[in-house]
């Protein structure tokens, strides 16, 4: 951190915080706790995790909250346990049981075959208890109000869906899986659909842990308890931008120019990328359109340099 960066600049303490979320708390609970621990209201999160789920949750702190809208968190990875033979209202363990069936006779080969059909580019109906909007209202709110509705299938990509262990629990079968998928994929819906395909009764998740979001993994993450012992971001704003985006080196004159909102000559990089000055600081996020590489976010405007 440069000595020129004053506390009032919003750059001191700015960066991404990667939290290993505990079960039983909401993503908003995590944000509220981090605001207290870091002593700032400027904390936001990218994406959410269900209360039952644990694992990687990406937060922005101070000026880095503006990075969140540009992060390409389009791929995610999970470990999960699916219970076959029992369907719930939420497709996870937090819901009420609505149907049961004996799954003990399901073979490993049958499970593998149906897992295969749920892998690749698929059409998935999201879980009904979700944040998806139906006529302007959240699906989970409609469920609580007792209203009936149907969610349309969505195109999602499940690049990996692998069974790593199986256990028989009486009439139920618990299957440990690893999933890599596109943003918008509901692992709860995979559990539901696997159960329906195998025994006619939707399965549900008994555990879910997110191990990766985009380039951010559990290796970057800290629990709230660890954060309380040593408050601070996981990646400062420079490391965050350079981890999350492709980058381009710029000279001092170019850095000064884009810090004042001017554009540079394009060099053929697709999508949003970071412009890095000779000292290693991220000056701006740029995007090329036609004959210009223009800023979509100035990380270090001239007034803060």
From Swiss-Prot:
Pfam families: TruB_C, TruB_C_2, TruB_N. Signal peptide: none annotated. Keywords: Isomerase, tRNA processing. GO terms for molecular function: RNA binding; tRNA pseudouridine(55) synthase activity. It is an enzyme of class 5 (isomerase). Its EC number is 5.4.99.25. The active site is at 50 (nucleophile). One of its GO terms (biological process) is tRNA pseudouridine synthesis. Transmembrane segments: none annotated. Gene3D superfamilies: Pseudouridine synthase, PUA domain. It catalyses: uridine(55) in tRNA = pseudouridine(55) in tRNA. Belongs to the pseudouridine synthase TruB family. Type 1 subfamily. Responsible for synthesis of pseudouridine from uracil-55 in the psi GC loop of transfer RNAs. NCBIfam families: TruB. This is tRNA pseudouridine synthase B. It comes from Rhodococcus jostii (strain RHA1).
